Amino acid sequence: LIEELEVSPSSILAITFTKNATNEMLDRLIVSADNTGQYEEIITSKSLHKIEKEQIRYLQQKKYKWIDSLTVRTFHSFCYSILRNYGVNEFDNKFKIIGDEKRDEEDDLSKNVAPETVFEVIHKLLIEQCEDISYLLQLKRYILDYIIDKVHLNKTDNKFIPRDGKYYTSLDGTKVRSKSEQFIADWLYRHSIKFVYEPLLNVKDFYFRPDFFIPDANLYIEHVTDKSYSMANKEEQFHLGNLLLVKTFENMTNDSALFNHTLDSILKNRLPSNYFKTISLNFKEEFNGYHENVKDFVTQIMRITDMIKVENIEIDNVLSDARKDQHERVRNFYELAIPLVKKYIEYCTNKSYLDFNDLISRSTSLFKNHEDIANKYKHKYKYILVDEFQDVNNLQVELIKLLLTDQSQLFCVGDDWQSIYGFRGSNVNYIVDFENHFPNANVVKLNLNYRSTDNIVGASNEVIKNNKNKVEKEVYSSKKSEHKIVVFAGSSEEENIQFCFE
């Protein structure tokens, strides 16, 4: 463009995904301009520290004016500069960047980083949300059921069948055999009533284990289901020992209000009145021993927050759709998640924080609402290059389209085979269906692989051809090899790691 068509370097925008990719692009440009070959030796040197290379790269970039006039940025860095210059029309232009981790890079984004990470904020908000006892107990029940016990997998995966038949964990950590018994144990726990689960009892003739014993009421509870053994012999033993036995029945559990009332009636006149005060619960005590599981939950909140922003979905619509899901686990998760997502967004707005998705969404919003600002960028950048296009998401494509005019030239490089970030919101359809998203486009397929051997490329062809959503192409290798591919499937993660190590 610059050499043959004499295009002004300042009219070229090159967008990448990572800082490393940006540096690599700049390095290639500088190497192409450096006739001495010294710069290539510098960037490949193992004796120079990363910071030293950054400093040399900066000086070399300034040395070549045409390179310095180019705009080579990540999506986030590009949007950061837009919002710093014009963000007052959309948000607080003194915003700080909040990310998944603390940044130590020497770039614009790192200079204005928030003092806390996304994880730290959501974790803090989760603790605050758990001041609502109802929420705290729902969260603990979710973690116990679906992260600890994995009850949604018990019926289909033998790996999760416990030897003692006790699938379910109650709020106090007691393992029980059914959801109904879990309900009873949880009810007792919430009302600060001590209990013993399946105590070993011998009244006269034989040993047996009633379901629950309430010491302070000297009362036994048997929960009867269609899977229960006959109660006749047990009831006779209770009668002989003059012991108090109360039975609950499975059909009562169909109505939680009725079951609550039943348990209340059973114990109402058998315990002091102060037993019916709700137990004092707090986050630290309830989740002691479950810290890693809470971290997993927070990580899931971070993920769906990203997806909501990338897909630009109304938060309330997410919850209403989730409530219709056929799976209880999904319904329960979103009931817990959406209040936190809302609080996180409110918190960040109040603190003038923008996360990486916000940088792009706020920039697109700025362009849509302020045509004069959008036109400045449209007129400046006539030539736009996007690298790793297979990883773009909806927000990023929307931003690109807002930069285009009839005179713009868009050049995208990508490989649908390398699309691995769908879990983060990337949409491979943009490269597979490129001509529909960008009409009048010319698609060039590069089918010669210079990196891998023919055995690897051949196997890849065989695997990828099963993909439904792909660019039709046959890839060939420039390298021959006599080494065959070795397939190893270990029985555990540790075994797989050991194989790779050896």
Residue map of PLM features:
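Conserved RecA-like helicase ATPase core segment
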Residues: L1, N394-E493
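Conserved helicase NTPase motor core
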Residues: L13-T16, A21-T22, L26, T71, ...
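Coupling/hinge elements of helicase-like and P-loop NTPase modules
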Residues: G37-R57, D92-D104, D132-K140, S273-E285, ...
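ATP-hydrolysis module of ASCE/P-loop NTPase motor domains
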Residues: K63-T71, Y86-N158, T253-L336, V443-K445, ...
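Short beta-strand-loop-alpha-helix junction that forms the active-site gateway
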Residues: R209-E236, L240, R323-H327, W417
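Catalytic cores of nucleic-acid endonucleases
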Residues: T225-R270
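Conserved helicase/translocase motor-coupling segment
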Residues: F499-E502
